[in-house]
Amino acid sequence: MDAIATIVELVREVVEPVIEAPFELVDIEYGKIGSDMILSIFVDKPEGITLNDTADLTEIISPVLDTIKPDPFPEQYFLEITSPGLERPLKTKDAVAGAVGKYIHVGLYQAIDKQKVFEGTLLAFEEDELTMEYMDKTRKKTVQIPYSLVSKARLAVKL
């Protein structure tokens, strides 16, 4: 596991227990933006998060990060508590299951019917298989995608 992945896992271990319902920890990213190191913690709740929510969560999360010993951060960083946005990543099976009926974008490790990217409505997620309806030019088609082939999935905005 590389240093960044280790930091993300350490942060997840201490942050997950302090984020309580109705909030949900969606993702954690740590990396350089410009010359600054940024620790981004993506949090959501059913009706969406507000600026006050992010301020409250910062007050809860920041002190917890200071308890990690030894300090895993090699340099000073900025803490960012934020919403995952409209195109929220679907990084777990539970997240995919919660997206049934929604419009999603799926990237694959290996092509199905000569396609490695599908965008459409997730009709079902059962027994480790996604069933999606998508448009192929002017025709609606359905595709079965084994979860093991999914490299990346996120909610998508239908234009």
UniProtKB/Swiss-Prot annotation:
CDD domains: YlxS_C. It comes from the Bacteria. Its main location: cytoplasm. InterPro entries: Ribosome_maturation_RimP (IPR003728), RimP_C (IPR028998), RimP_C_sf (IPR036847), RimP_N (IPR028989), RimP_N_sf (IPR035956). GO terms for cellular component: cytosol. Keywords: Cytoplasm, Ribosome biogenesis. SUPFAM superfamilies: YhbC-like, C-terminal domain, YhbC-like, N-terminal domain. GO terms for biological process: ribosomal small subunit assembly; translation. It is found in: Cytoplasm. Required for maturation of 30S ribosomal subunits. PANTHER family: RIBOSOME MATURATION FACTOR RIMP (PTHR33867:SF1). Belongs to the RimP family. HAMAP family: RimP (MF_01077). This is Ribosome maturation factor RimP. It comes from Streptococcus pneumoniae serotype 4 (strain ATCC BAA-334 / TIGR4). The gene is rimP.
